[in-house]
């Protein structure tokens, strides 16, 4: 299935929507309109990007956006020639892969989120066009924009270990490695249930532990172990991991924004000195129990926040 993406102005989007009939209700978050035309799905996103999906995507895009279609083809050719780094096509991007990654493990506030995502060879060009990259190189705004598009066409499973459950498991002796192993394994299994596994070439996990450690903590067998690989700095080696990273980071960012609204103060990410100060303010204004409900209790920030309050 071909996928073609364009970035259009508001004027061009209005023109496009006047050419065929679009649905504008009951759409996924981040999507403005959707249409089915000549066996091709046309999605218009709030970001101004338009995606054509289907075996006739190229022909339909040329019919509906003749000028833009030609420009996009020329730009793609120039970009591929001029920027060989974009075409690193590290092994995994030549195959159909499930990638998995997590967010929030190094942050005092907020949950631990894990995502597994299935990316096919056919997805690779569109993901590069959308600007999918290592999430560490992307702003929160860009991550939200990308994730709201990715979840509409990438088979995935997103799991969230909220702070209350996280703290209970940690008190039972669960390390973060164990939590992540269990969540990654579960998310991967969930994705396998959504796809034809005969089409899968590899499962690529952004490595946070060696295979034997992961296997020990996962609580259940690794599905398709012969196809499973562990990669350090996986986001830069596999677009499947990059997609999983963006979606898991999106879930974490969204939750952090909600926490900030609930307590009427901006909650910082990470585990630095700014976090200690905000944690102390939360204790003072809402109590230690409220702090514990939105944070990872075993981090040193909790103790440091209490020390900040002692002189007061």
UniProtKB/Swiss-Prot annotation:
Manganese or magnesium. Binds 1 divalent metal ion per monomer in the absence of substrate. May bind a second metal ion after substrate binding. A divalent metal cation binds at residues 101-102, 206. GO terms for cellular component: cytoplasm; ribonuclease H2 complex. Its cofactor is Mn(2+); Mg(2+). Residues 95-311 form the RNase H type-2 domain. Keywords: Cytoplasm, Endonuclease, Hydrolase, Magnesium, Metal-binding, Nuclease. Endonuclease that specifically degrades the RNA of RNA-DNA hybrids. HAMAP family: RNase_HIII. This is Ribonuclease HIII. It comes from Staphylococcus aureus (strain MRSA252). The lineage of its organism: Bacteria, Bacillati, Bacillota, Bacilli, Bacillales.
């Amino acid at each position: 299935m071909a996928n073609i993406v364009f970035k259009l102005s508001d004027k061009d989007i209005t023109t496009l929507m006047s050419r065929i009939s679009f649905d504008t209700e009951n759409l996924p978050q981040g999507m403005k309109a959707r249409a089915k035309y000549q066996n091709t799905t046309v999605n218009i996103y709030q970001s101004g990007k338009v995606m054509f999906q289907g075996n006739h995507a190229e022909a339909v895009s040329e019919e509906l956006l003749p000028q833009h279609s030609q420009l996009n083809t020329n730009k793609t050719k120039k970009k591929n020639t001029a920027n060989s780094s974009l075409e690193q096509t590290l092994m995994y991007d030549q195959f159909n892969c499930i990638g998995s990654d997590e967010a929030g493990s190094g942050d005092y506030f907020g949950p631990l989120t894990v995502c597994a995502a299935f990316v096919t060879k056919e997805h690779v060009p569109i993901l590069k066009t959308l600007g999918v990259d290592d999430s560490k190189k992307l702003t929160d705004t860009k991550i939200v924009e990308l994730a709201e598009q990715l979840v509409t066409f990438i088979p995935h499973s997103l799991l969230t270990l909220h702070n209350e459950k996280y703290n209970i498991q940690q008190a039972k002796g669960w390390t973060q490695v164990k939590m992540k192993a269990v969540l990654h394994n579960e998310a991967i299994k969930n994705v396998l249930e959504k796809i034809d596994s005969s089409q899968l070439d590899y499962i690529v996990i952004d490595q946070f532990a060696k295979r034997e450690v992961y296997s020990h903590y996962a609580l259940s067998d690794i599905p398709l172990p012969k196809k499973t690989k562990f990669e350090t700095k996986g986001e830069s080696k596999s677009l499947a991991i990059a997609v999983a990273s963006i979606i898991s980071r999106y879930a974490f960012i969204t939750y952090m924004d909600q926490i900030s609204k609930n307590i009427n103060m901006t909650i910082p990410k990470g585990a630095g000195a700014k976090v200690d100060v905000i944690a102390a303010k939360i204790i003072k204004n809402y109590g230690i129990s409220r702090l514990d409900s939105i944070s990872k209790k075993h981090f040193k920030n909790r103790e440091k926040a209490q020390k900040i309050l002692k002189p007061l």
